[in-house]
Curated annotation (Swiss-Prot):
Domain RCK N-terminal: 401-519
Gene encoding the protein: cpaA
One Pfam family per UniProt: TrkA_C
Keyword entries, A-Z: Antiport, Cell membrane, Ion transport, Membrane, Transmembrane, Transmembrane helix, Transport
GO biological process, one term: potassium ion transport
Protein name, per record: Putative Na(+)/H(+) antiporter YjbQ
Keyword Cytoplasm: no
InterPro entries: Cation/H_exchanger_TM, Na+/solute_symporter_sf, NAD(P)-bd_dom_sf, RCK_C, RCK_C_sf, RCK_N
GO cellular component terms, A-Z: plasma membrane
Major localization listed first in the record, in broad terms: membrane
Sequence similarity: Belongs to the monovalent cation:proton antiporter 2 (CPA2) transporter (TC 2.A.37) family.
Signal sequence residues: none
Coiled coil: none
Disulphide-bridged cysteine pairs: none
Amino acid sequence: MAHTSVASLVVVLIVAFLTPILLHRFKLSIPVVVAEIIMGLIIGKSGLNLVVEGDTWLQTLSMLGFIFLMFLSGLEIDFSSFEKGKKKQFLPNGKEAPNTFAAASVIFVGIFILSLLLSYGFVLAGFIQNAFLMTLIISTISLGVVVPTLKEERIMNSNIGQIILLVAVIADLATMILLAVFSSLYGEDSGNMWLLMILFAAGVVLYFFGRVFKHRSFVQSMSKGTIQIGTRAIFTLIIVLVALSESLGAENILGAFLAGVLVSLLSPNKELVQQLDSFGYGFLIPIFFVMVGVKLDIWTLFQDKTILIMIPLLLLALLVSKIIPVMYLKKWYDNRTIFASGFLLTSTLSLVIAAATIGQQLHVISTNMSGALILVAVIASIFTPICFKKLYKREEQPEEKKTITFIGANQMTLPVTLELPEEEYDVRVVHVYQENAEEKLSESVFAVETISDYEHETLESLGIFETDILVVATGNEDMNADIALLAKDKGTERVIASVGSPEHEAALKEQGISIFSILLSTKTLLRALIEAPGVMKLLTNQESSLYQINMENSKYDGVILREFPLTGDVIFVRIFRGVDSIVPHGDTRLKLGDRLIVTGSRGYVTDLKKTLEG
């Protein structure tokens, strides 16, 4: 019988509130979600038994927390990481770095094959009857543990960091899809697996719908104040896909995960992602994890000798299934790095809980077995990040240059190429020259690459769009707009185009393309010289100009400026946070994702950039 008293909810919320405070007070370096499960053990069946398990409030909020956790798991998948392995890189030891996607794919295939073999071992030993479910449990990897650990160690953008991240991303995607297949095969509506295609088709339609409307001006204007249309759209998407997945006989968490993947593909702004994280990890998800601990009865588990024997064996299987495939990296990395990577990839939590819960609901495994699997996941998530930090020795990475490509060599672009600092940028200039201009080109001080034409096929075959920044500045405005839109469609992160007409300007801005023109630049410069000559002096001063730094180091998240360890003559001029522009003062707190406008000597600014961008 369901209870509607809020007393149990109050207990759970107080515990969820106190958990991170206690972790901080006692300086315990374990994931907060693991600590929440442990606190649930203390107040639940295994401990003080303060929570009524059948409480309606808790059941509803816990289920919503589970759904939102799966949504955020999908949202955590950074699809741009699949593109980061194309450029040739060199490791600190001088070896050429492996292609991150290829290496991650090989490692995951190894993990999956080994997990399958180990699963059959558990079946033959009589611990479990379903090898499919056990394969998913052994092969899964927790993005929720991997991503914060990589960020904390500031190796997210390194070659090894990207490989670890990609393995976790591929494992997350593959496990979730296979979990949906498992649910369809062993559920009440088994044999209707083709219905899942309807869910994925709906996801594709919703993705293109979102892509069309994302940059519309009315959407931008409705994303502020009390409307927050972006947040409303995301919650609507979650509920629609959850309802659709349930109506098709699939698990509701598949719909939530798909919603997260779709939002991630649409590249939401960081401010919106932070809002969703704050809501999820600040309210619903802690309730879910505390309730996971509340429902676990470890004393009953420990009375089962089979479970007691299986727990250490499963922990060993988790380690073996990750460390052996990671040995593939031995030709590039030392043993400490390989073992550290294997330990971090062993961390597993949310999808194990999902798999165990679904397995129990489908009567594939018992309640005790479900509890044992969750307990193993908790233990693994406690010690594996600690082992990673102990084993991994961070080597200084060579400063990675940004690549910038100019299409069009003219009086605007060529002087800029000489002024960009060589230690920060690899510059490439391409241009279509007339035959009678070849001699002048050979005598020029500028390094310009001659191409036959600006056709789409030509530009793509030359790898023009595989650059960090693309500046399109040919003499033809229509061509500039066309190439800029193509580049954005091909995935170029930053595109700058030279256009002057209002029609082109509006269309390009909707796609997130920066624009410039001689007329606009001249008007802006003249107005600045008239109204604020001091600002123009600051902008054009080579020694102390304005610089943008992206705040990406979680170590300084929440630090107030007066306590920030500034060096030299660096001054914070402005902070851009989402759509807000903040005038900084001593009590201003830095936040992840901030774009900082600073001024000062180049050397000190470079040091600050290394500190905050890692």
